[in-house]
Amino acid sequence: MLEFEQGFNHLATLKVIGVGGGGNNAVNRMIDHGMNNVEFIAINTDGQALNLSKAESKIQIGEKLTRGLGAGANPEIGKKAAEESREQIEDAIQGADMVFVTSGMGGGTGTGAAPVVAKIAKEMGALTVGVVTRPFSFEGRKRQTQAAAGVEAMKAAVDTLIVIPNDRLLDIVDKSTPMMEAFKEADNVLRQGVQGISDLIAVSGEVNLDFADVKTIMSNQGSALMGIGVSSGENRAVEAAKKAISSPLLETSIVGAQGVLMNITGGESLSLFEAQEAADIVQDAADEDVNMIFGTVINPELQDEIVVTVIATGFDDKPTSHGRKSGSTGFGTSVNTSSNATSKDESFTSNSSNAQATDSVSERTHTTKEDDIPSFIRNREERRSRRTRR
């Protein structure tokens, strides 16, 4: 029997913690963009760098160990600094239902302290999601090795982990794109992930999703993919769904996902057929036995636009490969899906990129002439063929 909850639901408390220089920078850019219903926390061993943070809560960790002078690119010092300041970290996390821990892997503070912070958050009962970057190849083997160890430590500490190799930034931006603008693309994975989840649990829908649904999909699931796609006009539902599951910045593909939370937001013209079209695209790209939780929201302000939000987990954790100049930006497409407006002017990819959005899905799994056919279409045809044979 289906049961429907009525009445007021307490909104989940979301906190974003930036650890180290890279994490602090990501938090600053999120704050500059403007986000509601989220608390920001900056953690660093470097007191001078911490003073530049725009977060409302700042924690200088390891004051006795480092005297505020940083971790010297030594992850062990970063780890010990976080352990020294455990009580301060616990106080900052207190009351959070969901915690995003973001950092750049390869240095000292982020690599060493972020797993400690994430472990504390999870031990305190918060749904804990890590969003980390791997260093560029040109940063050297030592930094790459430290980053790999940091990623493994994060995997052990969080519920789900999203990894962004910085080298992928070279695949999605033009040669003339300024460095800081390129880094914003990586930050979009975090920003739009937080925004998407915040909107899912804050906005009531015709078919409603809540924080319990988010926990079902993301608790203890390893790697994760989060995507947002927006489209309008003809085939808008299909195009939005394709964009949402195509993330060339991420190490994880939706192919084989065993858990998917999907939400479709549209104007009053959103039809049941369009909802089915979008759901079919996502379901056919995932595992055959996927556990899919589906919701819809009607927002008259969107008019002709449809926004598809996808959270996918339950993978085999095999890194994916991507071709250059693949479709959309890191978190599906660069859109703000708040209930007030949808912004489409943040993408740094070319105008033709949307037409290529599904290529990255097929590139991850096939190297034959069938590469021109998106894998979710092949999967759908194979399933239909099996049903016919039965």
Curated annotation (Swiss-Prot):
SUPFAM superfamilies cross-referenced by the UniProt entry: Tubulin C-terminal domain-like, Tubulin nucleotide-binding domain-like
Family annotation (InterPro entries): Cell_div_FtsZ, Cell_div_FtsZ_CS, FtsZ/CetZ, FtsZ_C, Tub_FtsZ_C, Tubulin/FtsZ-like_C, Tubulin/FtsZ_2-layer-sand-dom, Tubulin/FtsZ_GTPase_sf
CDD domains (UniProt xref): FtsZ_type1
UniProt KW keywords: Cell cycle, Cell division, Cytoplasm, GTP-binding, Nucleotide-binding, Septation
Region (Interaction with FtsA) location: 371-380
Gene Ontology molecular function: any one: GTP binding
Variant or mutagenesis effect after changing residue 378 to A: Does not affect interaction with FtsA and FtsZ
Entry keyword Methyltransferase: no
GO biological process: division septum assembly; FtsZ-dependent cytokinesis; protein polymerization
Localization of this protein: Cytoplasm
Region (Disordered): 315-390
Basic and acidic residues bias (residue ranges): 361-384
Residue stretches of biased makeup (Polar residues): 326-360
Effect listed in the UniProt record for changing residue 373 to P: Does not affect interaction with FtsA and FtsZ
UniProt effect for mutating residue 371 to A: Does not affect interaction with FtsA and FtsZ
HAMAP family: FtsZ
PANTHER family listed in its UniProt record: CELL DIVISION PROTEIN FTSZ-RELATED, MITOCHONDRIAL DIVISION PROTEIN FSZA
Family according to the record: Belongs to the FtsZ family.
Protein name: Cell division protein FtsZ
